[in-house]
Amino acid sequence: MDQPTAAQPTIRRARPEERDAIARLLGEAFMDDPVSGWVFPDETHRRTAHPRFFGVMLDAALREGWVDVSEDVSAAALWLPVPAEEAHGTGSTADDPDAGAHDGSDRDGDGDDGGEPTDETAELLAAADPGNERVVTVARLTGEAHPTGTAHYYLPAVVAAPCRQSAGLGGALLASALDRCDRERMPAYLEASNTRSKALYERLGFVFCGRTVDLPGGPSLWPMWREPRA
């Protein structure tokens, strides 16, 4: 656990019993996210599907990676380890870290070497919105863009509750995880969902991979990579 300072809130690992609260947080914070709006264009349906959709992504992070939260669980960041031979993507949600981030609008599905969506995506479809082809599309396109060949940590989502988005919680979550990346000499990857978050991530050491993920008739995502700092 990181020790808090005057400028740094306490960040800790999520507990299993906090799973449902974190899923609700993700669903609420991403209601106005541009990628979520494209995947679920009807707002009423989005509100219903979101908790299930993000719940599947959250479960993947709890099972395979880790979830960092603020002490009061008003902010959370989901991280997944990606082996060198795999691409892991589904439209991330790592946006503005103090908002709903689609930088991550990953709802955790995989794009297997840019091919057909893998079992994670199928699980998302079944759990969140069966028959929604836009979930398949965002999974395929982000999977195609996801770097392969180098092991790294992937940030599918970082988010703060709407009422806490000016408290610096998203930045504290990122600082904690990126410190781990630096200690372990591990690169990090995410997809920014707007130019504001892209600029913020650049200040943290992320570099735009050079080609946007353009959703048909919808928003773009900026794949970004960060090498560990010495």
Positions of the model-derived regions?
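Conserved active-site alpha-helix within GNAT-family acetyltransferase domains
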Residues: 171, 183-185, 194-211, 217
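Conserved GNAT acetyl-CoA-binding A-motif
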Residues: 151-153, 180-193
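C-terminal "cap" of GNAT-fold acetyltransferases
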Residues: 186, 190-195, 214-230
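Conserved acetyl-CoA-binding loop-helix of GNAT-fold acetyltransferases
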Residues: 157-160, 166-179, 203
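Active-site rim helix/loop that mediates acceptor-substrate recognition in acyltransferases
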Residues: 43-66
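Helix-loop element at the rim of GNAT/NAT acetyltransferase active sites that forms part
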Residues: 24-43
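A short beta-loop-alpha structural element at the N-terminal edge
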Residues: 10-24, 28
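Conserved acyl-donor/pantetheine-binding loop and adjacent beta-alpha core of acyl/acetyltransferases
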Residues: 76-165, 215-216
